[in-house]
Design a protein with these regions (language model features):
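Phosphate-end processing signature that detects enzymes handling 5′-triphosphorylated RNA
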Residues: 1-209
C-alpha cells in the first residue's frame, strides 16, 4: 500500500502501467462505505486487528482482519468475511447493530467489552486487474477516501496492490516498479489506523507496533 501523491490521478496511474509494459484490464469503479468497530479501550486496534461492515451497492459484508506481518509497504493479513442476510441488513440499517458470527467473536478476545462504532470510511475506488506470467494476478486500486470520525472528517488518497494469485515475490516486483516510477511513499498504517489518527476520538494516536 502506498500514499497517493496529489499529482497522480487514475489516468496518470494507467499511463505508468502502460510505460512499465504491464498487461491489465480496467474494472468498473465502485463506491463503498466501511464502518469500523472497536471497544472503548481499542482492544482491536492495539492487537493489530479490525472489524468492519462494508456497504457496496446492495451488498453488506462483514470482515475481520488481523495483521500477520508487515515489511514496509507490504502487509500480510488474514481475513474472514461474512455476508449479512436480509434480516441482518435490516437490523444494521434500522439500529446500526452489526451481526458478527460467534466464531469471530471468540477470536476477538474482547474481555466482555462491547463493540461500538468508531470510524466511517467512504471510498471511491478505481480498479485495474493485472494478469502476468505463471498465473500471476493482482488487483491495483486507487482510493479516494473520506474518513468520518469524532473529530470531523479528513481526506486521504491511497494506492493498493493486492495479490490475488501467484507468488508474493511477483507482487513485490510489481509494487517496487510502481513505487519507483511514480515516486510513491509506503503507507505504513492500515486505513483503520490512519483514520483514527486523523479523526479519532480525542485525537488518539494509536500505539506504534
Amino acid at each position: 500500500k502506498f500514499i497517493c501523491p496529489d499529482g497522480v490521478d487514475w489516468d496518470v496511474f494507467l499511463d505508468a502501467l502502460n510505460n512499465l509494459g504491464v498487461r491489465y484490464t480496467k474494472e468498473k469503479p465502485c463506491f463503498q462505505i466501511d464502518v469500523y468497530f472497536d471497544t472503548p479501550q481499542y482492544i482491536l486496534l492495539n492487537s493489530g486487528a479490525a472489524v468492519r461492515i462494508r456497504q457496496s451497492g446492495e451488498a453488506y459484508i462483514g470482515a475481520y482482519k488481523v495483521s500477520q506481518n508487515q515489511q514496509g509497504a507490504i502487509f500480510e493479513r488474514r481475513e474472514f468475511e461474512w455476508k449479512l442476510s436480509d434480516n441482518e441488513t435490516k437490523l444494521w440499517n434500522d439500529e446500526k447493530k452489526p451481526t458478527i458470527p460467534p466464531t469471530i467473536i471468540d477470536k476477538l478476545n474482547l474481555h466482555e467489552q462491547t463493540l461500538r462504532k468508531v470510524l466511517a470510511v467512504e471510498t471511491h475506488r478505481h480498479i485495474a486487474v493485472v494478469n502476468g506470467n505463471d498465473g500471476f494476478k493482482a488487483e491495483l486500486s486507487l482510493d479516494e477516501v473520506t474518513f468520518r470520525g469524532h473529530k470531523g472528517q479528513a481526506h486521504y488518497r491511497e494506492i493498493e496492490v493486492e495479490l490475488l494469485n501467484g507468488r508474493l515475490e511477483q507482487l513485490k516486483q510489481l509494487a517496487d516498479s510502481l513505487q519507483n516510477h511514480l515516486k510513491l511513499q509506503p503507507a505504513v498504517d492500515s486505513k483503520y489506523k490512519k483514520g483514527l489518527i486523523l479523526v479519532g476520538k480525542y485525537g488518539i494516536t494509536p500505539p506504534m507496533h
